[in-house]
């Protein structure tokens, strides 16, 4: 088992989808007027999950009804049907991560609220044991990474495997599925709790169905809109590397060097910016301090990425090379994380330097070159413009065939006036703190809780309990 496989095993146990930073551009709900009656079928006790019933929710492939076909989505619901405060729908990340396998982990981590709420989780369309899109070459190349660059042929092959139906794997389609789930559960309102990409789905569900949301919990936030159409460049994440690593170095004993300058030097002296960034975004899942030489459940001496970066700048790259090799490879199975669904959703939802997926492929590269040339140094530092242009978001969708785009959220749209708890770790590179602050400004009834020293996925992975205590206080009120 190589380091990547070992780390991914840790992530699966900890509900980390080794880069579930949500690409977003964004999507609003499709009409579900043509949908069949929403109901849960084939109900049975969930295998290995005591107290939960697993069922099938059948949804239209195309919620407008113009294209025939259905999809079967697996749902797990707690058996406390008459929970006094109703349903808590918990949405996992990606896009590409299933929900049902994480029920035991989530139920354990937020157990104090589940005496009052009925926990429900779902394998979103294109994910999970029974519905994952399987694109073998793309899966092998990128696994669950947003940032790893796939071979162009693997992208094209994946789009062909999915076929014309790839247009129906947008966030808008998932939002329509979620409202069918609400109807099938027989509730008028529910708490919607999302992590990472799950926050994006939750935000868009609330925008499309404000009357059906009692509260929102947004953990490790992807904002619901991208007014500047720059999120494909991952500019906020690139810039966050400098501030996050510097903050980590200020913890005693303080570093005697500047880790952000080390990254900048390496990128400008032959280092592969994309692979370094990809590694750092993955590394946060095993060590939010960025300085622990021996993080739990990985080989001894594997950690302390800050030291590895500094050593590489001083001419000793072996440790950094080990980290890059160990953390930047693909390898997840589709049922753990569907790279095909990930690509289909992002390339339909997002907007790029060339526009949307409706722009012919030959016209995209010239537009990308022009946009990259306009990037200022302070937009990408400590990285460079090439890193921004070469990341997995851009390079995947650069080669994705013509696909009608999902509609965007208005750049000036606000979340509805429902109580909203926003949880953010100040060490998060996947969904940086700046995104949480941006979304808090767009939510009229938001409470932002910043957990210092924590990285991604506060409810399930925070070392302490500040975020969960905030959740426990927020939900009963």
Where are these regions (language model features)?
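C-terminal motif of bacterial Sec signal peptides marking the signal peptidase cleavage site
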Residues: 16-18
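Bacterial signal peptide processing site
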Residues: 20-22
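Flexible "cap/lid" loop of the alpha/beta hydrolase fold
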Residues: 222-241, 310, 319-335
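P-loop NTPase catalytic cores that bind/hydrolyze ATP
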Residues: 272-310
């Amino acid at each position: 088992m190589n380091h990547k496989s070992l780390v991914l095993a840790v992530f699966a146990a900890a509900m980390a989808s080794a880069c579930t930073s949500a690409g977003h551009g964004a999507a609003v709900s499709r009409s579900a007027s043509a949908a069949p009656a929403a109901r849960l079928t084939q109900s049975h006790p969930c295998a290995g999950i005591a107290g939960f019933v697993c069922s099938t929710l059948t949804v239209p492939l195309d919620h407008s009804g113009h294209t025939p076909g259905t999809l079967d989505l697996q749902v797990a619901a707690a058996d406390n049907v008459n929970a006094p405060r109703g349903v808590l729908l918990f949405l996992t990340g990606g896009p590409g991560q299933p929900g049902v396998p994480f029920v035991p982990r989530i139920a354990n981590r937020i157990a104090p609220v589940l005496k009052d709420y009925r926990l429900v989780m779902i394998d979103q369309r294109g994910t999970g044991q029974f519905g994952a899109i399987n694109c073998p070459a793309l899966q092998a190349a990128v696994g669950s990474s947003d940032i790893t660059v796939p071979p162009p042929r693997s992208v094209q092959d994946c789009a062909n495997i999915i076929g014309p139906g790839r247009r129906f794997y947008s966030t808008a389609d998932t939002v329509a599925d979620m409202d069918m789930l609400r109807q099938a559960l027989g509730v008028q309102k529910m708490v919607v709790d999302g992590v990472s990409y799950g926050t994006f789905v939750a935000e868009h569900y609330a925008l499309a169905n404000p009357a059906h949301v009692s509260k929102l919990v947004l953990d490790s936030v992807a904002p619901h809109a991208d007014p500047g159409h720059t999120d494909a460049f991952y500019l906020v994440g690139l810039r966050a590397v400098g501030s996050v690593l510097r903050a980590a170095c200020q913890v005693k004993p303080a570093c005697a060097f500047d880790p952000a300058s080390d990254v900048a030097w390496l990128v400008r002296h032959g280092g592969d910016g994309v692979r370094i960034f990809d590694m750092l975004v993955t590394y946060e899942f095993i060590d939010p301090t960025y300085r622990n030489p021996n993080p739990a459940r990985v080989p001894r001496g594997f950690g302390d990425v800050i030291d590895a970066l500094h050593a590489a700048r001083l001419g000793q790259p072996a440790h950094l090379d080990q980290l890059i090799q160990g953390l930047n490879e693909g390898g997840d199975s589709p049922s753990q994380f569907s790279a095909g669904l990930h690509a289909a959703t992002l390339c339909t939802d997002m907007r790029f330097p060339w526009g949307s997926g409706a722009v012919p492929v030959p016209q995209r590269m010239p537009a990308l070159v022009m946009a990259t040339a306009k990037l200022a140094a302070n937009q990408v530092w400590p990285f460079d413009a090439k890193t921004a242009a070469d990341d997995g978001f851009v390079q995947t969708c650069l080669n994705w065939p013509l696909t009608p785009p999902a509609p965007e959220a208005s750049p000036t749209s606000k979340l509805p006036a429902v109580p909203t708890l926003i949880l953010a770790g100040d060490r998060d590179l996947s969904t940086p703190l700046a995104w949480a602050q941006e979304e808090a400004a767009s939510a009229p009834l938001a409470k932002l809780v910043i957990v210092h020293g924590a990285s991604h996925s506060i409810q399930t992975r925070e070392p302490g309990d500040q975020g969960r205590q905030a959740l426990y206080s927020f939900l009963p009120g």
